[in-house]
Amino acid sequence: MLSPRRTKFRKQQRGRMTGKATRGNTLAFGNFGLQALECSWITARQIEASRRAMTRYTRRGGKIWIRIFPDKPITMRPAETRMGSGKGNPEFWVAVVKPGRVLFEIGGEVAEETAREAMRLASHKLPIKTKFITRDSEAQEA
């Protein structure tokens, strides 16, 4: 699973998820992509499950790019622990995703129907609504 090799600080504050993605909202590598329509934390496990679903469906045809990285540590306290005595230990890592962010891309020798179905399977593993985009659809919107 994805996680940073080392960070400057072990723990982070939760922060806010307002506004839209200003970076990473266009296709950069492949011809097809999966774009977020809502904001959410996406865990490293969810990213890995989506990647596996896409890889399995495309049968290693083409290339898959993961455009998000879980760089935010989420801390948890043990169950039935009294209040106080500091912040809990980091349990898992999440990627903060805002609307408009491209999550995954597929390129290479892949038909649009295959890419669409692979992205649909990947989107079922994610906690947000998503949209399938292509280079053509991106050009029409601009």
UniProtKB/Swiss-Prot annotation:
Residues 1-22 are annotated as: Disordered. Keywords: Ribonucleoprotein, Ribosomal protein, RNA-binding, rRNA-binding, tRNA-binding. InterPro entries: Ribosomal_uL16 (IPR047873), Ribosomal_uL16_bact-type (IPR000114), Ribosomal_uL16_CS (IPR020798), Ribosomal_uL16_dom (IPR016180), Ribosomal_uL16_sf (IPR036920). GO terms for cellular component: ribonucleoprotein complex; ribosome. One of its GO terms (molecular function) is rRNA binding. One of its GO terms (biological process) is translation. SUPFAM superfamilies: Ribosomal protein L16p/L10e. Residues 1-14 have a biased composition (Basic residues). It comes from the Bacteria. Belongs to the universal ribosomal protein uL16 family. HAMAP family: Ribosomal_uL16. Binds 23S rRNA and is also seen to make contacts with the A and possibly P site tRNAs. Part of the 50S ribosomal subunit. NCBIfam families: rplP_bact. This is Large ribosomal subunit protein uL16. It comes from Synechococcus elongatus (strain ATCC 33912 / PCC 7942 / FACHB-805) (Anacystis nidulans R2).
